[in-house]
Amino acid sequence: MNTVRVTFLLVFVLPVSLGQADKDENRMEMQEKTEQGKSYLDFAENLLLQKLEELEAKLLEEDSEESRNSRQKRCIGEGVPCDENDPRCCSGLVCLKPTLHGIWYKSYYCYKK
């Protein structure tokens, strides 16, 4: 009977206890790798953030250049009624009282200067 017990201990208990030790070692190795991976991810994240900030700065610079050179928007064209107090006529146009054909409307229109 003793040989059966010894055999049982050798065959079943010893591998289980060694397997648990390996499991603990594997767990420690995984923790080390994840810590290394986190530091690598932090580095990669910072690098990506720097690149995105540079790209954003370039895009904002281009937008400001476009806004300086772009044409006037939301203005009233020629022959369109306008408000005498708040004229929004496009550049090159003036808000004037109509002559002849538009007198009966009692309104101001955008005309060329």
UniProtKB/Swiss-Prot annotation:
Signal is among the record's keywords: yes
Signal peptide: 1-21
Domain of life of the source: Eukaryota
Annotated propeptide span(s): 22-74
Sorted UniProt keywords: Disulfide bond, Ion channel impairing toxin, Knottin, Secreted, Signal, Toxin
Cystines in this chain: 75-90, 82-95, 89-110
Principal localisation: secreted
Region of interest (Disordered), residue spans: 60-83
One MF annotation (Gene Ontology) recorded for this entry: sodium channel inhibitor activity
Annotated Gene Ontology cellular component terms: extracellular region
Database matches in InterPro entries: Toxin_22
Protein location: Secreted
Tissue and organ expression note: Expressed by the venom gland.
UniProt feature, compositional bias: Basic and acidic residues: 60-69
Domain observations: The presence of a 'disulfide through disulfide knot' structurally defines this protein as a knottin.
Role noted for this protein: Probable ion channel inhibitor.
Protein name: U11-theraphotoxin-Hhn1a
